[in-house]
Amino acid sequence: MDSLMLAYLFPISVASIIAFVFLYNLFSSRTLKNKKIRTAPMATGAWPVLGHLHLFGSGELPHKMLAAMADKYGSAFRMKFGKHTTLVVSDTRIVKECFTTNDTLFSNRPSTKAFQLMTYDNESVAFTPYGSYWREIRKISTLKLLSNHRLQAIKDVRASEVNVCFKTLYDQCKNPSGSAPILIDMKKWFEEVSNNVVMRVIVGRQNFGSKIVQGEEEAIHYKKVMDELLRLASLSMFSDFAPLLGFVDIFQGNLSAMKRNAKKVDAILENWLEEHRKKKNSVAESQQDFMDVMLSIVEESKLSGHDADAVIKATCLAMIMGGTDTTAVSLTWIISLLMNNRHALKKAREELDALVGKDRQVEDSDLKNLVYMNAIVKETMRMYPLGTLLERETKEDCEIDGFHVKGGTRLLVNVWKLQRDPNVWVDPTEFRPERFLTENADIDVGGQHFELLPFGAGRRVCPGVXFALQFMHLVLARLIHGYDLNTLNEENVDLTESPEGHVNHKASPLDLILTPRLHYKLYE
């Protein structure tokens, strides 16, 4: 009887246990899921397929629109850019979490169709995925071009090019007739001096300036091709966000234009590479430019699976693009702000006169002692960062500010809002360089202080910070020390930002009247 009962009850007991375990796991997993998965709020107004992309067609500056959305949704919220989910953040604490605790996860920079087509796809150090290849190229770039030792070695080259451009500037602003004042297009001049220095350091060439006669046709062609490259690179492509709409890019002709430009860029770089290869064994080490260095070491590097010539061309192109437009834009903003804050300009000139006097030009060795000048540069980069939005992509699931973030999610840091946070900065909309001499004196722009990130942060921070700062300080000091600057009728400068491009350009020209204030022999 007991055996029969046991035989009867056993299957029921087993079935009951299985059912209980199943139901327990079902409900507990749902409970745990609901408890664990907490995502950042999603902004309303997304369209099918396009997501929130339609919001960026209003003409409003993206960083200002996203800043207003952050005021509504919080310092971390999500948006849909076509097929891509994007986490938008604008808080110092959250940004620090992204680039310290989760820095490895956010070490990839999303690429675009434009950069894939025109900058050698994944060979470029700017967009190649984080890994052994990126680390090797980054090391080469940092040690062979951007290290303190290398910057010291190329100091004379930089100074030589700056001298040439300032001689050109002096010739331009002479007014022997004494008639109507001569207006100098400072945006154009800043572009010339930036390009000359960068081109000389990277590939040993000088490509801009009114005094160039030899190779002028080549210089004009190069500038035309590079201007087109930068214009096309700034375009938003439907295929980057919604592949189903990729036919629109073809219809608009953007893809074919990019492919044509890529061939022109490659032809220029290939020509330079062949010239460097021919003179490889005849250039003294002290006279080598960056392309020379790349040629001498790329074969010994751990770059298996990558075409050596493509690596050299891609790396040099990335350095040129990263060092020309950006420094010129920063210098334009600095002078624009000083023209609207003449007291700061006066204070900067007094610092220069006290340190340098009026019997010689500013030299590299003076720069470290120009404390107020350094504060001016920091304050300008705080108010008008080169990149108002910093983009990354996480490789796998992680947690940010208590929110679950799925692998593949893109990160968009609103640097502009971050650097105008009233909880961090006193009077954030006011141009006040003195803040970096007092309450914010310990903050620098190298990416270690997350309140101020004009050059980015984490593993992908701009490697050329020291190069850019040394160059900008030298040009700025020479300009303010050597010239009285004024606008026509002493009007204020328009500080409107341009909505176009990846770099935060000033929308209108910067035309100034320059009057030499030192002995004429110092300009020769």
Swiss-Prot record:
It is a multi-pass membrane protein. Pfam families: p450 (PF00067). GO terms for biological process: isoquinoline alkaloid biosynthetic process. Its main location: endoplasmic reticulum. It is an enzyme of class 1 (oxidoreductase). Its EC number is 1.14.14.98. It catalyses: protopine + reduced [NADPH--hemoprotein reductase] + O2 = 6-hydroxyprotopine + oxidized [NADPH--hemoprotein reductase] + H2O + H(+). Keywords: Endoplasmic reticulum, Heme, Iron, Membrane, Metal-binding, Monooxygenase, Oxidoreductase, Transmembrane, Transmembrane helix. Pathway: Alkaloid biosynthesis. Its cofactor is heme. Belongs to the cytochrome P450 family. This is Protopine 6-monooxygenase. The gene is CYP82N2v2.
